Amino acid sequence: MRSIKTILAVLLCGLLAAGCIRAGGGKAHYPSSKPLTRWWWFARIIKKEDVKYNLDWVKNNGFGGVEIAWVYPLNRKRFYSEPLDTNYLPRQEWQSPEWSSIVAYAKQYADSLGLSCDFTFGTGWPFGDTKVKREDATQTWHEKNDSLKWTYAVVSWEYPKKGYIINHMDQRAFDRYAQRMASALAPAMKGSVSGLFCDSWEVETSRIWTTGFSEAFKRSYGYDINPYMDSIYSRANFDERYDYMKLVSEYVVNRFYRPFASECRSLGSFSRVQCAGAPVDLISAYTSVDVPETEAMLYEPPYSRIVASAACLTSKKEVSSETFTCTYGFPRYDAEKKRMDFRLRGKEQVADLKLVADALFANGVNQIIWHGMPFNPVGIDTIMFYASVHVGRKGNLAKDIPAFNSYMTKVCRYMKQGVTFSDVAVYLPVEDSWETGLMKEPDTQQPWAWGEYEMRRTVPPAELRGYNPIWISGNFLRNASVKDNKLVCGDETFSVLYIDASYIDLDALRTIVRFASKGLTVCLRQVPRQPGKNKSPEFSKLLTELTGMKNVSREFPGKTGIKPLVKGDSLPDFWCRKNGDEYYFFIANPHSMDLHLPLKYGQSFSSDTIQRDLTFNVSGRELKLPVEFRPYQSVILKIGRKGDPQYLDISYDPPVPKTEPF
């Protein structure tokens, strides 16, 4: 029976991928807009009374639910210079009946409180454990040892045991892993619907490989990739690198992300996924799952526009965010290089967090997942997680969490109204990122980030700021259509396709020419080249045909007549939703612009009211308004069919932040 359900789910996922029906169909997967919190279960004996103790606090502090994440035992010393403690602490064994039982109890008790209860689909970050066989483990080109195959032993529930990370390019490896995980979670899947979570990509990506890849590559591209692999990231091999990355993306999306989403649906669940860091066409990956999720601050807020765009293109209501991760920076060693500096942990300030939340709302996020709450036994609140703010009974945030949660709930409720509104689709330069290879400007805050393929710093062109532009990739364009001279994707229609890319894939160019011939206005800001090793004479012919059309121009807005949704000097970041004839604008306080990791302690401090004179163009009307931002306040403006503006009450005054923690 389960195999039939899985087949049906795979067929459904294929229809979604083809753009035949809407993924999610605008369905809300969470019963409320209240924030959830990630809830770290450290590897130990988990007791029912402790589960109840934690969940009661969650309920009483304005949360909508939890996401249970299984991680390391507390004796392992991850961030100290001395050797790791490898003594084995007692715990419910991973995926054992005892483990399944206590997980099911947590779900049942959450249900009794009216809380959502999601689960990570594994332990640690990437999927894997000690039961993964070597033939199912992740691979890289010319492996010299197994060091890159192991799970992050120091973050796994099974620590100090080592297990393999699954091969994300082999669906059979995923299927075998998923069967075990689904069986262990089965008792907990009863009751309300639980989301199943996949974290951001933390698998070795450099020269990622799988059995049969070489043969598949030759069939697809007509040449042998093997001679290029040792130097695939060199500048000389940019075209070969593009072909390699394109096939890797197809493998990962079709053999991991789509199967994961299908598996979740077959279990009566839904997928919530971070595709950040994956070697993929991000729009294709994020559109394949039910609830696309971003994260901040390890990915800065503007990145979230990619995630929210994927939701918009497939009519998904929710865009979630793992929020407040490493807000003040990733923990670092102290001056003596002996211990990690955790002095700000537990001293976080809610005004600083509001800066981050508002920046996310202005980039399309409408469901907050706190990062997060460590599991603490009854009467204890001294256990903390290393890379997050502290959600718990003690710490600087404790007294402010209920009111802050109420604020975020209110904003998210408004920003789930109707659908995202935009009139401009902007081409996501995936091809450029793959041709570029290594990051042009490595991030000293995040030395593990090395490839442009992550698109960490990709933002829309400055001239589109007032248009609330939506990213679309060349690969996803084939799922769209043109009707009445407009680009149609799910519930969304766009009057203009804006392209500012150095490279465009041949298949994408064919689609663009076809759409332009049907009347779609295209802004082609530069003359692109064909990526990949195999050049086709068709490319230049198509480009000549495209640039010769009257509805194709190098200028924007040019003769399109399209006005920006919002116009004004020093325009703040904003997001727009439309519900029937009503428009909802979330306009972030200007202090939420240009946030970078790490935030300074007390960066949110402000004493001045800021005014922006803004012009709104909706429903054929031009509305000029002075918009006032009091200290720490953002704005939601509702504009009705007749152009009547209404400021919605989302006021929340956090405590004035300190600028020095000690």
Question: Where is each model-derived feature located?
Answer:
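Bacterial Sec-dependent signal peptides at the C-terminal "C-region" and cleavage site
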Residues: 17-28
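Catalytic and substrate-binding clefts that recognize carbohydrates or anionic sugar/phosphate headgroups
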Residues: 126-187
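Boundary/entry segment of secreted carbohydrate-active catalytic domains
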Residues: 27-44
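Bacterial N-terminal signal peptides that target proteins for export
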Residues: 1-8
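N-terminal cofactor/phosphate-binding cores enriched in small/glycine residues
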Residues: 37, 44-87
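Bacterial N-terminal signal peptides
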Residues: 8-18
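A solvent-exposed, charged loop/short amphipathic helix patch at secondary-structure junctions
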Residues: 85-87, 161, 442-446
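Carbohydrate-binding surfaces of carbohydrate-active enzymes
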Residues: 35-36, 47, 51-52, 65-66, ...
